[in-house]
Amino acid sequence: MKLSQGQVMTTSKGYIFDIKRFATHDGKGIRTTVFFKGCPLSCKWCQNPEGLSYLPQVLYMESKCMHCLSCVHASKQGGVKCVNHKISVSRNAREDWDAICDVCPTLALSMDAKEYTVEKCVHEILKDEIFFKREGGVTFSGGEPFLQSDFLIDLLKACKEKGIHTAIETSLYTD
């Protein structure tokens, strides 16, 4: 996204665990739904339990693993080990999880969320701009978008500057 003269892009950042395109149930028209990480509730009927934790977490899918041990070699703090020919992941270890996930050729290790700047998120949203001309737009969902209120407000302002209709799905939880 290129900024117009006089436009200021904020440096606030937030954690997003998914961006769904061509959503038709999250507001009027065809929408892009941006899922914020973090929710203070633990509803039994939660449709997005991967969004409950505020911080990104490493995911391991054993069925994808080919036991190449690249992750074990990339692990500096012992967060990934091979025990009895099985990969063991200690999510509490202080590791550079992004670097470890990057060396996994089969994506058996991945992060459940990514950090986005406002500019990067708006860039992703604008990939669907053609659908916003008539009645679509972007819906911010979660998790709970208001847990990352500074990031949400900056995103809302940036979308307004671009003429993108916005909606928020929320439990109305705020700090």
Regions found by a protein language model. Give the residues of each.
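Sterically constrained small-residue positions within well-ordered secondary structures
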Residues: 7, 23-25, 131
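A short linear-motif detector with a strong N-terminal bias
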Residues: 10-15, 38, 45, 101, ...
